[in-house]
Amino acid sequence: MASIDAFSDLERRMDGFQKDVAQVLARQQNHARQQLQQFQAEMRQLHNQHQHLIDELQRLATQRTALQQQIHAAQQATNTTREQWRSYHERESELSRRQSTLAAQSRELDSLLQQRGKECVQLRARWAAQSGNDAAEVALYERLLQLRVLPGASDVHDVRFVFGDDSRCWIEVAMHGDHVIGNSHPALDPKSRATLEHVLTVQGDLAAFLVVARDMLLASL
């Protein structure tokens, strides 16, 4: 009878763990979607700015052509004063400078659009790869290390790894951008934290990180 109760308790714990993992992964996926939407909105805005600059360049080119025709006519007209002719040249020079400035801005925006497009492709690839691997890895670590995965206390993108049943042995990691080691209980000394960050960020080995972190935390209790 005791073994049946223990199995039921384990089943409830597994259900709770799966719900916790689903919530954490859902938040991470929602953040990735928001980043992608933001990139797309920025790209639309940049496209609009780029098109506006192209239209402005065309308008300035038309004005410059008309002004050059006026200059030529002024040079031929016997009643055109030297001051008026100089004024036309000054205006033509100003339009030429503005046209050059807008052309440079257009090239910069075009380069930025290409960069943002590449970033969107990379973001989609990371999101697809991460969403496919997280659930299986977390389930394996839970069985091997008595691990639970909970949301972090300070940031929606942080994850708290809890070892054991009493919630006194845990460590938090920022899961977006560079993986940064956060708070832990018990607190770890700087040397231990540096070791964990090396395993996670340099070696990129999440499994090794969880094993080493668990051993360090249990040894410090």
Curated annotation (Swiss-Prot):
GO cellular component: kinetochore; Ndc80 complex; nucleus; outer kinetochore
Record flagged with keyword RNA-binding: no
GO biological process, one term: cell division
Main location class: nucleus
Region (Disordered): 76-101
Record's subunit section: Component of the NDC80 complex, which consists of TID3/NDC80, NUF2, SPC24 and SPC25. The NDC80 complex is formed by two subcomplexes, TID3/NDC80-NUF2 and SPC24-SPC25, which are joined end-to-end through their coiled-coil domains. It has a rod-like structure with a length of 570 Angstroms and globular domains at either end. The TID3/NDC80-NUF2 globular domains are probably directed to microtubules, the SPC24-SPC25 globular domains to the centromere.
Protein name, entry field: Kinetochore protein SPC25
Naturally occurring in which organism (per UniProt): Saccharomyces cerevisiae (strain ATCC 204508 / S288c)
